UniProtKB/Swiss-Prot annotation:
Keyword annotations from UniProtKB, A to Z: Fusion of virus membrane with host cell membrane, Fusion of virus membrane with host membrane, Glycoprotein, Host cell membrane, Host endosome, Host membrane, Host-virus interaction, Membrane, Sialic acid, Signal, Transmembrane, Transmembrane helix, Viral attachment to host cell, Viral attachment to host entry receptor, Viral envelope protein, Viral penetration into host cytoplasm, Virion, Virus entry into host cell
Residue spans crossing the bilayer: 720-740
Name of the molecule in the record: Envelope glycoprotein H
Stretches the record annotates as Interaction with gL: 217-280
Localization of this protein: Virion membrane; Host cell membrane; Host endosome membrane
Subunit structure: Interacts with glycoprotein L (gL); this interaction is necessary for the correct processing and cell surface expression of gH. The heterodimer gH/gL seems to interact with gB trimers during fusion. Forms the envelope pentamer complex (PC) composed of gH, gL, UL128, UL130, and UL131A. The pentamer interacts with host NRP2. Forms the envelope trimer complex composed of gH, gL, and gO. The trimer interacts with host PDGFRA. The trimer also interacts with host EPHA2.
Residue intervals on the Intravirion side: 741-742
Glycoprotein keyword on record: yes
Gene3D superfamilies in the cross-refs: Herpesvirus glycoprotein H, C-terminal domain
Family statement: Belongs to the herpesviridae glycoprotein H family.
Amino acid sequence: MRPGLPSYLIVLAVCLLSHLLSSRYGAEAISEPLDKAFHLLLNTYGRPIRFLRENTTQCTYNSSLRNSTVVRENAISFNFFQSYNQYYVFHMPRCLFAGPLAEQFLNQVDLTETLERYQQRLNTYALVSKDLASYRSFSQQLKAQDSLGEQPTTVPPPIDLSIPHVWMPPQTTPHGWTESHTTSGLHRPHFNQTCILFDGHDLLFSTVTPCLHQGFYLIDELRYVKITLTEDFFVVTVSIDDDTPMLLIFGHLPRVLFKAPYQRDNFILRQTEKHELLVLVKKDQLNRHSYLKDPDFLDAALDFNYLDLSALLRNSFHRYAVDVLKSGRCQMLDRRTVEMAFAYALALFAAARQEEAGAQVSVPRALDRQAALLQIQEFMITCLSQTPPRTTLLLYPTAVDLAKRALWTPNQITDITSLVRLVYILSKQNQQHLIPQWALRQIADFALKLHKTHLASFLSAFARQELYLMGSLVHSMLVHTTERREIFIVETGLCSLAELSHFTQLLAHPHHEYLSDLYTPCSSSGRRDHSLERLTRLFPDATVPTTVPAALSILSTMQPSTLETFPDLFCLPLGESFSALTVSEHVSYVVTNQYLIKGISYPVSTTVVGQSLIITQTDSQTKCELTRNMHTTHSITAALNISLENCAFCQSALLEYDDTQGVINIMYMHDSDDVLFALDPYNEVVVSSPRTHYLMLLKNGTVLEVTDVVVDATDSRLLMMSVYALSAIIGIYLLYRMLKTC
């Protein structure tokens, strides 16, 4: 018997005893023998170990031979050969080896392993002190808290922007409702599985615990990142091929038990006041995970109070995610994506720890935190998962219950920003049927307010944050199509060349606090015609900055993989160049350079030879049908003047195109004020040029040429205003005469 095994069995027995006393199994003995000869039979790696009911052996004692009982009724003796006629004898309670937990442990230990194989196993896995040499400890104080306090939104609105208040229909307040709630269980996902963790692992004993799994499969079954979350710790599994994956285990780890000869200290890479990080990776895999040797690996996740959820999201996850997105590393497994996955798992872990604080939290703050958790989950799926994704969505029943109650209780959500987050939570938790039409109507009105605010200015960080959430709503719901179509056209109209140019300039800045800073409406809009080739054609004399490819890469990553939530657009091939415009409740337009979709088409004739532009009008109630053939066509009428009476030109799109380059800009005009703004020569939206033309795509399905249009602003509305003003003047004059007479 090789040296060290007796000590190992003693340690094993102590572990078994402690687990038996603390587990739900308890200590128990088998009441009946397995057969007539043996008391216990264990299968260890397919080789049975039999414990005899009765057996004797001879040993030398004071120069005399005597028999010694090896197996007794209440104990099992282990005799280990030391030298000729010398044994180490250990007596252990039989009940330690007779219960289900004992079988679970012993079946994971190969007691028949040869010395050569044992020595090979010693050199298989990397040890931190020997192979990584990058151990670090952090001494910061850890406390569950929220550094944003009661701030209702992560990014606050500009001081000069008035946030609309929410109007709610009269409802009955549920009994027992209070304005503030404890954080207990609020951000804790539902642990819907009982997992056998580390089953069959070379180094670890398996453990049974409530948990949840979330996998992100990049290309195939061999390349993935998997998150396993338990009550006390989480595991990040990184697989690059079919070999043993790397494990990052973080948290409170007394239940993570190592097999001999390894000990926990051999694998501790990072250590904080309350938690440890273990890394288990084979030596021959270190070349693929060389970042484990970097002394600053995971510093941005662990060198502050990471139990502060808001600080964790800002300082850690968003920092890593921004780096991944800007560098185009989505769908790759390297240091950046591994750190991002770890920060995501740490956010889930910290969110579940919020209940430890036992503090009260307002409804708007709770909604913002929960929406932030769901938003980073959505980004993880977008960035890492293949298409279509196979990732299991996490469920938050307590947060959903809070959202439902707040939705039907007056005065609980007063600002539109809180309503946006509430609806976002319900939509991402498969609760679309609970979202009322009045809620989405107000969100669409908020989108229109942002549209008007930024007609002549670049988007603020706050606007990008809100449009990010609303853009996701558009593509994740099937209900309330009218309101979703309105939000969709707002995002499409905001995706201009000016916005794309400004967005590329933003990417040149080295620091971005949140992912929403890198959001552009182009990501959620109907514009699918931006490409590096097209931008190069539009600006042939300009040097394309390095941030332009990064911007287009971000668009490619963040854009939805389908338009299936819109029945009249779902069949559009997203790999082709087009613009989809949902200008009104019933009418959509698709702008392409070839016939692509069935409908009423308006071919544009004022383009050079070799260039084509086709505008196809579809009905929102008609199922999308792909076609490459010419179909029903109408001619485009030139309009010489526009009247604003009856708002006939409201809910339309102004399309700017070039004879040689095709579509340049698209602007959404919701009401008469937008039309006046667009056609006012002082705003330089419509600029006279021999090669540039302007079309207006109307809500009634008509397309007009408006390059030389004149706006008739003397409509009945302005006339009535003049009449009212004149009447007021006359009234004041008559009142003056009466007072003077008196």
